[in-house]
Amino acid sequence: MGSLDPLAWRLADGDPDAPRELVERHHIELYRYARALLRDAPAAEDAVQETFERAFVALGKYPEERIETLSLRPWLYRITLNVVRNAWRQRRREVPMAETPERTDERFWTVPGSVSGADYKEAWMDALEALGRLSERQRVAVALRYLEDLPYAEIAETTGWPENTCKTLVRRGIGRLGALLSDAPDGKGDR
């Protein structure tokens, strides 16, 4: 499913403007993804920075054949997922999803095509707390599908899981989220 992304070629060829363009194009979406999984703004920022560092190094070493088939966006999400998993291992525990994200971190609340506001943030807070109660695989699949709006083919490419597995994980994860949110103790479970 590779696509010829001219930016990948420019990065591999050492174009001095290409790294800035890559960061501008993908920073917010990768930050939002890492932030949803790590639940820690500084750790998410570190994860995204490490993602870009790894990407720049790898592209400089890849053979031409690899660059020809590289789908840049799923590849960056996969690097981010690997960096996040390393952070989880370093913590020697599951993702601390009981913590709540800072309400002032506007990048986290910026979702393409959405409206902002207190109701939106509150609904996301509830959803993200419930997201933390999913299995790691369901959490990753649901975040990629609904937080980052990736198609199933890109989720499969990002995670290395079969596309049907991704669909199943998302379906089961959404079902579990629905059950968790409908049982919300504050009466807000019907969102």
Language-model-detected regions and their locations in the chain:
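DNA-recognition helix of helix-turn-helix
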Residues: L81, R85, W124-A130, Q138, ...
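N-terminal module of bacterial RNA polymerase sigma factors
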Residues: M1-E29, A36, E129-G132, E154, ...
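Short, charged helix-capping/linker segments at alpha-helix termini
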Residues: A12-E21, Y31-E50, E64-R66, E163, ...
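Short, basic/polar amphipathic helix motif occurring as a linker/hinge flanking DNA-binding modules
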Residues: N86-V111, A118, G187-D190
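Arg/Lys-rich amphipathic alpha helix in sigma70-family domain 2
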Residues: V57-E64, Y77-E99, Y120, G178
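Structural recognition of an alpha-helix C-terminal capping motif at a helix-to-coil junction
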Residues: D46-E53, L70-N82
